[in-house]
Amino acid sequence: MKLIAGLGNPGKKYERTRHNVGFMVVDELSFRHQTPWKKSKFNGMVSEINVGGEKMILVKPLTFMNASGECIRPLMDYYNIQVEDVLIVYDDLDLPVGKIRLRQKGSAGGHNGMKSIIQHIKTQEFNRIRVGVSRPLKGEVINYVLGDFPKAEQPDIIAAIQKSADAIEDFAQVPFVEVMNKYN
């Protein structure tokens, strides 16, 4: 069993923002597998998919980005999921729009959602997919990540969401290092 968490902020006003690209990836998986989202007792929306016999718990924390770990750790405990079976999908300002990078460990890199998860699961050694959203050319980062993708970037971000979902489906069947080799 795997736990796949897409990071974002709950609420309609954040739905299509750069900061919610993690939600978009797990939404794509739920859509592909035609599985509903249900509110869990761990302050998140949960959907269960099955890929080649491997159960995957998809989660969208409802804690807002900066407290994502408050949802992830209790779900790991409840489902008895080991850290090597956890994968976090989140936005990355340091990658161009549409690029993805897979890693098995690393720091939070200034991402508050990742800081919260590292704090709550007490390790930096877990799988992650970073989805590029680029940096603003000028202006504040906060307004930028809470803004929607412009029309010109839509094809690139849609491709990145689909590629990320493909990588997650592969993770159901092969070790993450093989998935990294294929998609990086």
UniProtKB/Swiss-Prot annotation:
Which Gene Ontology BP terms does the record give?
protein quality control for misfolded or incompletely synthesized proteins; rescue of stalled ribosome
The UniProt entry, under CDD domains, shows: PTH
Query: Site (Stabilizes the basic form of H active site to accept a proton): which residue positions?
Result: 91
Which reaction does this chain catalyze? an N-acyl-L-alpha-aminoacyl-tRNA + H2O = an N-acyl-L-amino acid + a tRNA + H(+)
Q: What is its main location?
A: cytoplasm
According to UniProt, residues marked as the site described as Discriminates between blocked and unblocked aminoacyl-tRNA are 9
Any Gene Ontology CC annotation: cytoplasm
What is the role of the protein in this entry?
Answer: Hydrolyzes ribosome-free peptidyl-tRNAs (with 1 or more amino acids incorporated), which drop off the ribosome during protein synthesis, or as a result of ribosome stalling.
Note the subunit structure.
Answer: Monomer.
Q: Protein name, please? A: Peptidyl-tRNA hydrolase
Q: What is the lineage of its organism?
A: Bacteria, Bacillati, Bacillota, Bacilli, Bacillales
Name of the encoding gene: pth
